[in-house]
Amino acid sequence: MKIITLLWTLMLFGVAHAAGKSVASMIKLDGQFKMVPGRLRDAVAFGYFDEAINKTGWNYLSIRSNDEYSNADQSYAAGFLEGALTAKQIYIQIKIHYPDPAPPQKVQHFFDANAKWEEEEKKSGKNLDYWEQRTNLDIQVEGIYDGYMAIAKGAMRNVTKYQVIVATYEYDVWDLSIVLPDEGNVCYNEPRFRNRCHGGERVDHCSALIKILPNNEDVLFSHVTWAGAQTMYRIYKAYDLRLHLRDGSLIPGHKVAMSSYPGRFTSGDDFYITSARLAIQETTIAIWDESLNKNIKPQSVLQWARSALAYRLATSAQEWVEWYSLYNSGLYNNQWMVFDYNKFTPFEPLRDGAFFIFEQIPGGGHGGDMTAWLREKTYWASYNIPYFKDIYNKCGYPAKVIEWEAKAMSWEMAARAQIFRRDHRKVTDLASMARLMRYNDFQHDPISSCNCTPPYTSQYSISSRSDLHKKDGVYPFPALAFRDHMGTDVKIASMKMLDDHLGAAIICGPTYDQQPVFEWKTSQLGPLAHEDYPARYDFPFYIARMDVDGEMDFDYTPFYHLK
């Protein structure tokens, strides 16, 4: 490692700054941690933050730890650096998304019982590597809080620990606030969760596509997040945490790149690529049959931790499913897709075991090797509806087909299923994949039609733009209507990019290929807080690569911009 020398260095809170970029190291002297500016040779960890959101649509964070230190020291230092380097972003997120100083009491009771159960499991002598790595996650979370508080001044300090760290496990809180027996029937008050209360509208939370290119040249792995406009405060992150298993070897997923948000070291979209050459993503599925929720118990591992443990410990797609399905909490239920690039050779057929999916529900799940399907069809599409019949039926989708319509609830006939089935053949390279994942011509595509006034909806396409719907439109159910809901990004992985410093093609912002560019000042959504957000989301795709020239920074080059 060499020390980074900056032309202009500002000694402020132990961070070196230059042109929007910050570099800091965590050292340990006489048993005490200290953050210092720049990159130091023998540091426990160092971090790099590029505040480029108004230039590219993303901020960029990378953190690398030193394997000469213990797992606990590396985890704490990594968390501390993240909390310190992104303290401003964490605070802005708190103001917009996390006004509540604590979770609902019923959720806190669940967390307390869960923590007690986990401590007993750690003493059982089973799955020792799993539980040691589970402990490391909690240490990293503590580091985020301490790093934030080390930087916070003035109003930034008027927050609770919960508000600083809740981003990490927000989806667990999200579901628990709804499914646990009511204590006063108070719904979770955080803005991004309010429409998930009983009786609220369903929120589709992603489109995904895996596509084999012609002649088996490569396999593209892509994901679109669907969410509200205020979630477009993004950080693309890369970690190289040199944590060890009990046999002394490095964890397989010690390097991971992901799309993410301030204050968390999981993705949340979810989209990951790892040093084990795995690509991982999901789309959320709904639990319409609430009787399943009786299976949600604190004697489990929360979803945020299971996803992090799986991407760190897995060496194959099958192993990822095995790790993730352990101690199922039944929270934040998704169809997960994992592609193993170790089982792919360009211009040759996929080898068995290359592609697995896993669908989780409270009390169970169903996974399987879908390589044969992918080999035959050349694509796999995911759109918030379970594939496996047992999961589909248990979740209550057949009744929803009758209540709503097949175009919304049927795995075979969903609008996005139809569009992917029609258009996947157009994907022949990275640029054409980018175009498909940004596609939404809802005013003209017959698949986007509905029994509505006007007679179409952007929900029936690949990248939603519900912010463009008519406010006075008439729709058969709320999910199709005007609301703060849109495709907020695209991420695309490939073997070629993965093997080039865990690279990925990324874009932040709603589609503007067939629709107008999203601008806060002209949006129908009205006056939503957006401090430090880009004013206009007309960014191109960028190729983001980590660890270029050993510096653990980001290289981002635009490659596709619709003219």
Per-segment meaning from a language model:
Residues 2-18:
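Cleavable N-terminal signal peptides of Sec/SRP-targeted secreted and luminal proteins
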Residues 15-319, 323-563:
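N-terminal mature-domain region immediately after signal-peptide cleavage
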